[in-house]
UniProtKB/Swiss-Prot annotation:
It catalyses: N(6)-dimethylallyladenosine(37) in tRNA + (sulfur carrier)-SH + AH2 + 2 S-adenosyl-L-methionine = 2-methylsulfanyl-N(6)-dimethylallyladenosine(37) in tRNA + (sulfur carrier)-H + 5'-deoxyadenosine + L-methionine + A + S-adenosyl-L-homocysteine + 2 H(+). The lineage of its organism: Bacteria, Pseudomonadati, Pseudomonadota, Betaproteobacteria, Burkholderiales. Its main location: cytoplasm. [4Fe-4S] cluster 2 binds at residues 157, 161, 164. Monomer. It is an enzyme of class 2 (transferase). Its EC number is 2.8.4.3. Binds 2 [4Fe-4S] clusters. One cluster is coordinated with 3 cysteines and an exchangeable S-adenosyl-L-methionine. Belongs to the methylthiotransferase family. MiaB subfamily. The gene is miaB. Its cofactor is [4Fe-4S] cluster. This is tRNA-2-methylthio-N(6)-dimethylallyladenosine synthase. [4Fe-4S] cluster 1 binds at residues 12, 49, 83. GO terms for molecular function: 4 iron, 4 sulfur cluster binding; metal ion binding; N6-isopentenyladenosine methylthiotransferase activity.
Amino acid sequence: MTKKVYVKTFGCQMNEYDSDKMVDVLNAAEGLEKTDTPEDADIILFNTCSVREKAQEKVFSDLGRVRELKEAKPDLLIGVGGCVASQEGASIVARAPYVDLVFGPQTLHRLPQMIDARRESGRAQVDITFPEIEKFDHLPPARVEGPSAFVSIMEGCSKYCSYCVVPYTRGDEVSRPLDDVLTEVAGLADQGVREVTLLGQNVNAYRGAIAAGSAEIADFATLIEYVADIPGIERIRYTTSHPKEFTQRLLDVYAKVPKLVDHLHLPVQHGSDRILMAMKRGYTVLEYKSVIRKLRAIRPNLSLSTDIIVGFPGETDADFDKTMALVHEMSYDTSFSFIYSPRPGTPAANLADDTPRELKLKRLQHLQATIEENVARISQSMLGKVERILVEGPSRKDPNELAGRTENNRVVNFPAPSAAHPRLIGQMIDVKINHAYPHSLRGELVLAHGDASAATH
């Protein structure tokens, strides 16, 4: 009987990528298959996030819920990975002694060895070291599930923003060699992947050796140019980028590489220079706006999303008003916005915070309502337009229909004959948008002359 692994993921897209790799590692080493039901699992893993306190506490809440599964099935293994694991280490086992494995983002490739050691010794295994890029040398080839895929190009962060735990939980920035990244992307393209998203905590800080041991370094712009030349790759995305690392070379790539999408996630975090300085972000609002102005001169249709923190210690009404002014000026399509959550061990955790939580919540609600208005307005502006989408698979709303994604990351659902589904999935096609909803669109297939038989038979 095939053994199964259940993985619950908290937090960022890097964690989503790491969770997929956990499954790949355990499948290659022990033949485990992924399950969406913890009750069916032989191994349960939590890939955790420590960016906000709520996510961190949710992990321990979930651990409490699976404890009874362990009591009913003593051979069940429970593991905690990700940033909470890096931060808490063995204290997780002290707090939840039924946990068998504790591993950091850089040691997930050691899971099979940790499992063997746990079974042989009967003791919980903890490995939260930072072996730099070793992880990627031990990961099996990715198993493709659709025409889009994520490729991690670097690990860690060296920015040390005053509020952020990532440098402490994932380590400093370490870039994969260029040839390793290109080999992975080419392998994905050979399996039918048409769109890749390049991942990193500060992805545009990429500085990878041309090959392992080489003294010659490729920057992020060079990497994008090489990825664009790989046969089969038709779209390139990346996340998350940092305003401080937006070089002229990267701006030039937007003019030279049409496969790089008209969508950018560029966290600003705040609209007040005073708060940005307290956050140690390393740029001013004017410098941030300058990057966007230059980009939109090259790509007038650029869609922009961001991250914003509300209620950072010392934030005044005037500071928040500056954030709102920036939101209106930038016309953000999406914002991941949250109330500031002090993280132990970070410099900002020691700052005095006398803003009432009710006021922070009111500010957050105002910000999110404004962003939602932007989302609706941008969606409405797409009505009647023909959009190029990558067909990803059956629609979640109606499996008899198909769904794809536009360059600005909108999901488009559209009807298509069932017989045509296998041919259309993984293809770049044109759809005309005829309905706009808050977070998705509906369209109809646009057929070029001579394409009708291919789509209807």
